[in-house]
């Protein structure tokens, strides 16, 4: 399922990447329920990136971080545009 390339890198097949993306989305959904602060899942995702040492957990952590940051930026931009207009 995972081919080890060199010593620190993984080469995931496309189906595994889809499963990891879905896992990231599901994990983000659970982590976003922890706090009303939109940056909490981003911080937890970054922690997972460092705990995973470049493997599957790091990949899921990166997905969570990306979703959390894009959602937080989207909320901030929406709030700013609501105040301006």
Curated annotation (Swiss-Prot):
Record's keyword terms, sorted: Host membrane, Membrane, Transmembrane, Transmembrane helix
GO cellular component: host cell membrane; membrane
Transmembrane segments: 12-32, 44-64
Coiled-coil ranges from the UniProt annotation: none
Subcellular localization: Host membrane
Membrane topology note: Multi-pass membrane protein
Domain of life: Viruses
Protein name as catalogued: Putative transmembrane protein ORF85
Taxonomic source organism: Acidianus bottle-shaped virus (isolate Italy/Pozzuoli) (ABV)
């Amino acid at each position: 399922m995972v081919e080890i390339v060199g010593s620190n890198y993984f080469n995931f097949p496309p189906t595994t990447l889809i499963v990891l993306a879905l896992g990231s989305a599901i994990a983000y959904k659970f982590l976003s329920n922890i706090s009303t602060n939109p940056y909490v899942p981003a911080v937890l995702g970054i922690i997972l990136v460092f705990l995973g040492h470049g493997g599957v957990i790091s990949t899921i952590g990166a997905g969570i971080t990306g979703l959390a940051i894009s959602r937080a930026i989207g909320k901030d931009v929406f709030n700013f545009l609501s105040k301006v207009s």
